[in-house]
């Protein structure tokens, strides 16, 4: 089973920046143990949500031709927690995109305020780790992750279609 720690993309600028959201719900079992009586989204899972947002951004920059693996959490600092009822916003920006790796600067927001900064380093596994015997199929970008990006793109197409329809009918009046 694969845990997905983002719910949707709200912005996606290829090779540059992605913004995703995570709605925190008390229905999530991990919140009942962290912490009993005061449930918060564990910072480790916030880092994973940012890594998923950024990993899709990095993978898309190369048309998902390579496996992108989180190589290092360079820095993660949090000023506050997300709690049930909150919506976290993950903003990931590519700082460097090279043949073997990519560097990401990430900011986490809650209710419009910054609550964390995260710097991540990703490796392109097909180039950097060919001797590890990784499976041929792209196990990093499974259908669940690609569905998040495709749903965002479908929403953009639908919005463009609606905007075009409004423009064409408003010219007749």
Predicted features and spans:
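Hydrophobic core residues within well-ordered beta-strands of beta-rich domains
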Residues: 3-5, 88, 102
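HotDog/MaoC-like acyl-thioester-processing domains
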Residues: 14-17, 83-84, 93-173
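Conserved positions in beta-strands of structured domains
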Residues: 7-10, 74, 79, 93-95, ...
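Hydrophobic residues on conserved beta-strands that form the core of alpha/beta folds
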Residues: 6, 70-73, 103, 115-117
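Short, hydrophobic/aromatic-enriched beta-strand segments in well-ordered soluble domains
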Residues: 22, 91-94
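Catalytic strand-loop segment that frames the active site of acyl-thioester-processing enzymes
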Residues: 1-41, 159-173
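Hydrophobic beta-strand-centered segment that forms part of the acyl-chain substrate-binding groove
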Residues: 54-89, 123
């Amino acid at each position: 089973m694969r845990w997905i720690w983002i719910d949707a993309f709200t912005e996606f600028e290829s090779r540059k920046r992605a913004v995703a959201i995570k709605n925190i719900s008390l229905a999530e079992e991990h919140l009942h143990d962290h912490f009993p009586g005061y449930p918060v989204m564990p910072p480790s899972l916030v880092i994973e949500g940012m890594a998923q947002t950024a990993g899709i951004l990095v993978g898309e920059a190369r048309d998902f031709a390579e496996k992108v693996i989180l190589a290092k959490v360079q820095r993660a600092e949090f000023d506050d927690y997300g709690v049930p009822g909150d919506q976290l916003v993950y903003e990931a920006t590519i700082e460097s995109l090279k043949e073997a790796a990519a560097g990401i600067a990430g900011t986490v927001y809650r209710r419009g305020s910054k609550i964390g900064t995260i710097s991540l380093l990703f490796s392109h596994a097909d180039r950097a780790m060919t001797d590890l015997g990784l499976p041929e199929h792209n196990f990093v970008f499974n259908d669940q992750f690609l569905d998040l990006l495709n749903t965002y793109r479908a929403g953009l197409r639908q919005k463009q279609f609606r905007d075009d329809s409004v423009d064409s009918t408003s010219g007749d009046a």
